[in-house]
Amino acid sequence: ELAECVGLSHGSIAIGASETALNLFLLDKLKEFHNTYPGIRLKIYNHSTPQAVEAVRRGTVDFAVVSTPVKADAPLHMTMLHPYQEILIGGTEFGHLAGKQTTFEEIMQYPLICLGKETVTFQFYRQLFASYGLDFEPDTETATADQILPLVRSGLGLAFIPKPMAKDAIDRGEVSEIRLCEKIPSRNICLIYDSKHPFKEAATQLKKMIAANSFASVE
């Protein structure tokens, strides 16, 4: 018990996290952990999902919390944590689209904003559009998820964004949800870790806290 107390009184944990995972899920867990174990230092690395998975594989982070779709081969272990739904939004310049249902083919005539080609979000939408025989070619690619909403508000184009991240801007009337005829598949926040990686007590405790109430586990 003494060793366990010492392990939770000081030390550090390295976490790879995508912005979406951080904003939609991880922040609340980190706050809870920090309040319980204030002596543990947290190192949060801003990674795309592929970067985070590679960091886990190399052992430069203890684990990662990222968005699907994600490929994690053994010995990496993936636990699904939290589902979320994305919606299409546009600024006031595209308000005429908000009052009707629109198809993927129809929105192709408008400028689109998305994360860069190296991200799983870009690949997710490229494959989704391809399933309808369409090429997904955004006019603007961003380096981070947090850049998308300001660009939409400024009228640079339409974008797909997690619904919780768009809620405040929608409520303020800065952007509008554009209803689609096609269904956007839901995505998930997931925990990735190396099952062969030895965890210190602090990392083990945070991992348990993050995975509490998770709904699926994949080896």
Across the structure, where does each feature detected by a protein language model lie?
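Flexible hinge/capping segments at coil-to-helix
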Residues: G7, P75-G116
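Short beta-strand->loop
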Residues: H77-I87, R172-S186
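Short helix-loop hinge/linker segments at domain boundaries
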Residues: E1-A14, H34-N35, D73-M78, A98, ...
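A late-sequence structural motif
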Residues: F25, S176-V218
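Hydrophobic hinge/microswitch elements
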Residues: S48-V53, R57-V61, S67, F124-I178
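Central regulatory/effector-binding core of bacterial HTH transcription factors
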Residues: H10-A72, T142
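Ligand-binding cleft/hinge of the Venus flytrap
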Residues: L30-Y37, E105, F122-D135
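Secondary-structure junction motif
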Residues: P111-Y132, F199-A203, K207, A216-S217
